[in-house]
From Swiss-Prot:
This is Xanthine phosphoribosyltransferase. It catalyses: XMP + diphosphate = xanthine + 5-phospho-alpha-D-ribose 1-diphosphate. SUPFAM superfamilies: PRTase-like. It comes from Staphylococcus aureus (strain bovine RF122 / ET3-1). Converts the preformed base xanthine, a product of nucleic acid breakdown, to xanthosine 5'-monophosphate (XMP), so it can be reused for RNA or DNA synthesis. GO terms for biological process: purine ribonucleoside salvage; xanthine metabolic process; XMP salvage. Its EC number is 2.4.2.22. 5-phospho-alpha-D-ribose 1-diphosphate binds at A128, N129, G130, D131, A132. InterPro entries: PRibTrfase_dom, PRTase-like, Pur/Pyrimidine_PRTase, Xanthine_PRibTrfase. One of its GO terms (cellular component) is cytoplasm. GO terms for molecular function: xanthine phosphoribosyltransferase activity.
Length: 192
């Protein structure tokens, strides 16, 4: 997605050779028009897969996921990082390690909203080592739901997340692939 790639190159801030900050349009302030295009693109890629639900994790995955859900005309469900007191019925649970925060969180999804009748598209803002996507995939498996694929907004292709997801048998669609953050510069796949 050319527009997204331009935005990553122009507004992304390289923190170090493994961390890219995109707070200006995705992780803090959200460019709604860009996220709408992200959602539309995911719809075009997965529209024939019978998607009944979009699944993501709070918080940064919500914007692209809700835009995709709008285009699919299906609910957007997000895994919570804390169990609210209102969640009294059953839930699915898994542990996810955040590469950026270097922290492991237990995330939950209510059994009320995910079942074996669902065909799920998992959407996440970043793909580094693949732990978040694999954790969400684990939740869909616990629910006996079908996973149609994984939609990633920004993939750090120099890390092993894409490979791990494919090894798990998952279809992965990354809209922007970053080849390198070396030299304090964003280099996209195809520009090396």
């Amino acid at each position: 997605m050319e527009l997204l790639g331009q935005k990553v190159k122009e507004d992304g801030v390289v923190i170090d050779e493994k961390i890219l900050k995109v707070d200006g349009f995705l992780n803090h302030q959200i460019d709604a028009k860009l996220m709408n295009e992200v959602g539309r693109t995911f719809y075009e890629q997965f529209k024939d897969k019978g998607i009944t639900k979009i699944l993501t994790i709070e918080a940064s995955g919500i914007a692209p996921a809700i835009m995709a859900a709008l285009h699919f005309d299906v609910p957007c469900l997000f895994a919570k990082k804390a169990k609210p007191s209102t969640l009294t019925d059953g839930y699915y649970e898994t542990s996810i390690h955040s590469f950026t925060k270097n922290k492991t969180s237990t995330v939950i999804v209510s059994k009320e909203f995910l079942s074996e009748e669902d065909t799920v598209l998992i959407i996440d803002d970043f793909l580094a080592n693949g732990d978040a996507s694999l954790g969400l995939y684990d939740i869909t498996q616990q629910a006996n739901a079908k996973t149609a694929g994984i939609g990633i907004v920004v993939e750090k292709s120099f890390q092993n997340g894409h490979q791990r997801l494919e090894e798990a048998g998952l279809t992965v669609s990354s809209l922007c692939k970053v080849a390198s953050l070396e030299g304090n510069k964003v280099t996209l796949v195809g520009e090396e």
